[in-house]
Amino acid sequence: MTTLLVLTNLPDRANADRLADSLVERRLAACVNILAPCRSAYRWKGAVQHDEEHPMLIKTTAERYSALEAAIRAMHPY
């Protein structure tokens, strides 16, 4: 069994909690760590933007990665 650590960022704690609960409940993740908010810089519509995000570390297996990715894409707000 190959273990993976997946990183994603959510815009707020409520979305992070909702996604974490869903992934663990559906057994797509063994554990999810919601980290302290951080400040992200990125380019959007031709300008550099800055926003606060909540990083998430998601522990899963290679066998469950495809289903995990699909769940994140379905629930992620951006």
Predicted regions located by residue number:
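Positively charged, small/polar-rich N-terminal and surface patches that mediate targeting and assembly
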Residues: 1-78
